[in-house]
C-alpha cells in the first residue's frame, strides 16, 4: 500500500523511483514525530525533517520498503530548512522505522547522511493489558516501586511508557501464572511521581501494539529534590558529576589543611625543644666550672723545723692567712710531691 502524504509546510511531493543517490555528502538532518511516535490506528502523524544546513529537498524513507521513499521541497525560516511529511490515516503497513535525508538543487543525487532512525508504532490493535504498582501507587519518597503489566493474551513483549517521555522500556513476558502473562518493571527508589501506561505486542510484529492500559498515576509523599528515573534508565545512578567534583575538592582542601597544621605543629615543637636544649647546655657548662673550682682546694702541706724539731701542719692559702706577719723568719723549700707541697723550715 502506498503512503498517503500531505505536505504541511512545503509545496509538492513526488515518489522517487530509480537508482538510489549517493549518500553522506552533507551533515545528517534530524527527524521528529508530532505529536509522538505512538500513533493510534486511523490517526495521522507528522514526521518533520529539519536541518541548519540549507537543503532545498528532503527525502523520507521507510526501511525495508524502497518504494515508500518520499520527496518534499524544503522550506527555510530563521536559518533552518525543514519539510513536514504527513503520514495517515495510520495503518499497519505504515508502521516501521523511518529515516530522512537532505539534498541541494545543484546536486540532487548527492544526499546528506541519514538521520537517526525513528520508529513509528501503531497502537490499538489488540486487547489492553493491566498495569499495577507494588507496593502501591502511593509511596514514600525513596521507597522502591515495581510496576507490573499483565494480560490474559499471550503477548511476547510488554512496553512501559511514561507521560512526557520520548522512549519506552520493554521486557519479555514471563511464564503464564494463574492464566495471565506478566512483566515486571523495577523503577527503584521513588523520588517523583508520574503517569504510566503499558502495551503488549507479539514478536513477529514489533511495530503493532495493543491498546494502552488504563493510566496509572504514581504519587510520592514528600518533597524530593531529584526527579524519578525514567523506565528507560537504570534505577541506580551515580551522583551528579558537579556535586562529585565539589566533594572531591572539599576533601582535598581538608587533607591539605590537616597536613599543614601537622607540619606547623612539628616545626613549633622542634623550635621549643632546641631552646630547651640550649638552656640545659649553658647550665651544664656553669655547673662544670663550679665543680672544677670546688675540686681544687689549693692546699699546701708544710714542714716547719722549729728549734730543730720537725712538725707538720696544714697552712691555708695566702688569702686566708692572718694579716699580721709572723715574727720568725721562715725559709721554704719545695718537695717533689705532686699532690702536696712540703716546705723545709730552717731554724735561725
UniProtKB/Swiss-Prot annotation:
Could you list which ranges are Cytoplasmic topological domains? 265-348
Gene3D superfamilies given for it? Answer: Immunoglobulins
Instruction: Output a single Gene Ontology CC term carried by this record.
Output: plasma membrane
Per the UniProt entry, the disulfide pairs are 49-100, 149-198
The principal location of this protein is: membrane
What is the stated purpose of this protein?
A: Receptor on natural killer (NK) cells for HLA-Cw1, 3, 7, and 8 allotypes. Inhibits the activity of NK cells thus preventing cell lysis.
Q: Which residues form a coiled coil?
A: none
Cleaved signal peptide residues: 1-21
Its keywords, alphabetically, are:
Cell membrane, Disulfide bond, Glycoprotein, Immunoglobulin domain, Membrane, Receptor, Repeat, Signal, Transmembrane, Transmembrane helix
A GO biological-process term: immune response-regulating signaling pathway
The residue ranges for the Extracellular side of the membrane come to 22-245
What is the protein name stated in its UniProt record?
Killer cell immunoglobulin-like receptor 2DL2
Source domain of life is Eukaryota
Q: Which organism is it from?
A: Homo sapiens (Human)
Amino acid at each position: 500500500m502506498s503512503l498517503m502524504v500531505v505536505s504541511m509546510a512545503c509545496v509538492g511531493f513526488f515518489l522517487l523511483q530509480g537508482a538510489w543517490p549517493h549518500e553522506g555528502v552533507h551533515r545528517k538532518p534530524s527527524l521528529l514525530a508530532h505529536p509522538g511516535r505512538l500513533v493510534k490506528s486511523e490517526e495521522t502523524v507528522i514526521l518533520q525533517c529539519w536541518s541548519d544546513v540549507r537543503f532545498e529537498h528532503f527525502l523520507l524513507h521507510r526501511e525495508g520498503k524502497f518504494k515508500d521513499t518520499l520527496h518534499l521541497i524544503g522550506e527555510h525560516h530563521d536559518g533552518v530548512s525543514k519539510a513536514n511529511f504527513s503520514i495517515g490515516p495510520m495503518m499497519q503497513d505504515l508502521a516501521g522505522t523511518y529515516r530522512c535525508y537532505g539534498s541541494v538543487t545543484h546536486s540532487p543525487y548527492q544526499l546528506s547522511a541519514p538521520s537517526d532512525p525513528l520508529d513509528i508504532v501503531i497502537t490499538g490493535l489488540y486487547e489492553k493489558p493491566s498495569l499495577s504498582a507494588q507496593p502501591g501507587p502511593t509511596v514514600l519518597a525513596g521507597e522502591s516501586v515495581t510496576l507490573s503489566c499483565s494480560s490474559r493474551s499471550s503477548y511476547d513483549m510488554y512496553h512501559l511508557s511514561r507521560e512526557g517521555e520520548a522512549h519506552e522500556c520493554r521486557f519479555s513476558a514471563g511464564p503464564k501464572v494463574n492464566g495471565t502473562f506478566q512483566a515486571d518493571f523495577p523503577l527503584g527508589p521513588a523520588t517523583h511521581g508520574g503517569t504510566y501506561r503499558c502495551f503488549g505486542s507479539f514478536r513477529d510484529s514489533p511495530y503493532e501494539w495493543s491498546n494502552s492500559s488504563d493510566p496509572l498515576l504514581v504519587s510520592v509523599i514528600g518533597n524530593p529534590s531529584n526527579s524519578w528515573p525514567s523506565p528507560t534508565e537504570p534505577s541506580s545512578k551515580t551522583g551528579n558529576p558537579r556535586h562529585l567534583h565539589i566533594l572531591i575538592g572539599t576533601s582535598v582542601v581538608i587533607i591539605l589543611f590537616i597536613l599543614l597544621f601537622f607540619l606547623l605543629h612539628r616545626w613549633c615543637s622542634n623550635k621549643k625543644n632546641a631552646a630547651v636544649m640550649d638552656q640545659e647546655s649553658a647550665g651544664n657548662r656553669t655547673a662544670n666550672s663550679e665543680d672544677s673550682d670546688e675540686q681544687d682546694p689549693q692546699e699546701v702541706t708544710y714542714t716547719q723545723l722549729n728549734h730543730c724539731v720537725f712538725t707538720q701542719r696544714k697552712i691555708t692559702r695566702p688569702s686566708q692567712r692572718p694579716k699580721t706577719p709572723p715574727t720568725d723568719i721562715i725559709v721554704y723549700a719545695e718537695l717533689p710531691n705532686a699532690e702536696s707541697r712540703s716546705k723545709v723550715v730552717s731554724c735561725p
